[in-house]
Amino acid sequence: HGASRLLDYGARRRDKDRAVPVLFVPSLVNRSYILDLSKRRSLMRWLASNGLRPLLMDWGSPGDDERGFDLDAYITQRLEPALDAARQLTGGPVTVAGYCMGGLLALALALRRPQGVQALALLATPWEFHGTGDAHSHLLSAMGPSLDGLLSLFGELPIDVLQALFTWSDPSMVSNKFRAFAAMDSHSQRAE
């Protein structure tokens, strides 16, 4: 469907018909490969080698089909068909796992289609949206017209704008992250 696709990390297993499918929903902001960084650093591959059949929703880059999509459209036109495909593998409900913002999308999917979801796992999913204070709210309100203008011009928010918004939410986050990377032994397993 559009730029989105469902990646099956258990399709090559000899026992794929017996492996338990789990539909993974990443954030719309991060690419799906955050859950499959490399052959040695991959949650999807590790789960596949340990008896599960991970199905990863890859949003791709928004194309013409996705221009103007809101969250409802991503849930109804992308996630619901992915859930249907996952259910075809088992003939019944499946586990759905959401990562970061994908957890909110997975939760919405589970609420819309409870008969299709056996279990729900939420990983690093934001849940507190009221603790940012009045200063953040006022600034976001003031930025609204500019963001609307960018959406009208590009049809989506450019990734640099999204990154700036995330950085703005915690200005020290980026410098702390790179300071920690710089302090690591570059040959250590953690640095991989």
Where are these regions (language model features)?
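Short, surface-exposed "cap/lid" segments of acyl-processing enzymes
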Residues: 1-63
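A structural boundary/capping signal
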Residues: 14-15, 82, 87, 110
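A structural signal for isolated positions on well-ordered beta-strands in alpha/beta enzyme cores
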Residues: 55, 95, 119-121
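Conserved catalytic-core motifs of eukaryotic protein kinase domains, centered on the activation segment
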Residues: 66-68, 133
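Alpha/beta-hydrolase active-site loop
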Residues: 68-88
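Short helix-loop-beta connector
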Residues: 90-93
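Gly/Ala-rich beta-loop-alpha elbow adjacent to hydrolase catalytic centers
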Residues: 97-102, 106
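Alpha/beta-hydrolase-fold enzymes
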Residues: 105-192
